């Protein structure tokens, strides 16, 4: 109760709660072990240069380091990815219809902007080629990142294994024999870290929607977290990956409107009794994609305890692919923090 009066006093005095530090991350940091697989083949006709060199695309390993650093920052040190192995896979992965690019055919297709359709990668072939289920079951890894060229056909994220559910894409089929579940991320190294954070944001939306799927509206804190002014006038909270509190349409992070929002409440979760205040685009980067996503992720609850049967540390669900209705292995058996 005292916190509510304190926040109200700050509002009257013009001391915005947004300038106040969020609560520290609860408990021991999560340290998921990542297998990173890079498809960046050399092209013989181009002097053996790799795709990134030929087309001036980003360094995959540098992208991965910045992505991990960004997530560590916006989780208040709570999510610390550990890249335990990197595989340079110097070939083009198989597509679902059996097609596979050669180095020469890919370069010519990209230059002509005539890429193969259908585009989708064969995930079952990828899981088998890199023995992903075996690595997971031997407790070597907790997550997989594929860093690939444009039109490799990867989903932004997908899930593998027993109890797998929608993770911005359907689960990888025929993997239910896996003793647990894990997430595969797909990143396009033509693009930047902003897009990688967008992938993680949609993963967040999928997992937290699943966690709260059986909660009645009054107890659905995920639905509350994602409100924005267009759908909840005067009652916006943090919005979602595509919609900031003031956005009028997808990707409209730079909308100049000023709207009332209760986004600051999430810095003091589970106390959500704040008075709200007027907010505008400069708080989340003025339209910059990466800055918006960092701002949004920093508002995710990350404290001890539980509310209505859901952990108050939502990062646990995101890092562990946890599902309160269909538990896989106990969390203590899966993360590198317990080695």
Predicted segments with their positions:
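Structural recognition of the beta-strand scaffold that forms the well-ordered cores
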Residues: 35-36, 143-147, 183
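Intrinsically disordered, low-structural-confidence terminal and linker regions
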Residues: 2-21
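Auxiliary, metal-adjacent structural segments of Zn-dependent hydrolase domains
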Residues: 133-173
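Active-site-proximal beta-strand/loop segments in catalytic clefts of secreted hydrolases
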Residues: 38-41, 147-151, 187-188, 206
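Flexible, surface-exposed loop/gating regions in the mature catalytic domains
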Residues: 168-189, 295
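Active-site recognition of the HExxH zinc-binding catalytic motif
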Residues: 190-210
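Propeptide-to-catalytic entry region of secreted or membrane-anchored zinc metalloproteases
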Residues: 20-134, 155-156
């Amino acid at each position: 109760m005292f916190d509510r009066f304190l926040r109200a006093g700050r509002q009257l005095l013009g001391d915005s709660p947004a300038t106040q530090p969020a609560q520290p991350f609860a408990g021991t940091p999560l340290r998921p072990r990542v297998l990173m697989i890079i498809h960046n083949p050399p092209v013989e006709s181009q002097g053996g240069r790799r795709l990134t060199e030929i087309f001036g695309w980003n360094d995959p390993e540098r992208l991965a380091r910045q992505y991990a650093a960004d997530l560590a920052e916006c989780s208040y040190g709570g999510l610390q990815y550990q890249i335990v192995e990197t595989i340079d896979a110097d070939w083009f992965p198989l597509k679902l219809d059996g097609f596979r690019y050669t180095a020469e055919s890919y370069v010519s297709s990209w230059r002509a902007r005539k890429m193969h359709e259908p585009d989708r990668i064969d995930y079952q072939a990828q899981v088998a080629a890199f023995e992903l289920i075996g690595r997971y079951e031997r407790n070597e890894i907790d997550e997989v990142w594929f860093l690939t060229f444009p039109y490799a056909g990867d989903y932004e994220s997908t899930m593998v294994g027993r109890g797998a559910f929608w993770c911005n894409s359907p689960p990888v089929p025929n993997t239910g024999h896996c003793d647990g579940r894990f997430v595969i991320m797909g990143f396009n190294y033509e693009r930047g870290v902003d897009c990688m954070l967008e992938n993680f944001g949609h993963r967040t939306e999928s997992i937290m929607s699943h966690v709260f799927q059986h909660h009645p509206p009054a107890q659905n804190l995920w639905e509350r977290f994602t409100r924005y002014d267009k759908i909840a006038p005067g009652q916006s909270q943090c919005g979602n990956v595509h919609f900031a509190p003031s956005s009028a349409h997808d990707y409209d992070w730079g909308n100049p409107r000023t709207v009332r929002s209760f986004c600051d409440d999430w810095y003091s979760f589970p106390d959500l009794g704040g008075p709200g205040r007027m907010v505008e685009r400069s708080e989340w980067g003025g339209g910059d994609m990466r800055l918006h996503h960092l701002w949004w992720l920093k508002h995710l609850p990350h404290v001890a305890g539980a509310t209505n049967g859901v952990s108050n540390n939502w990062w646990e669900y995101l890092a562990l692919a946890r599902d309160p209705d269909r538990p896989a292995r106990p969390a203590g058996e899966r993360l590198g923090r317990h080695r």
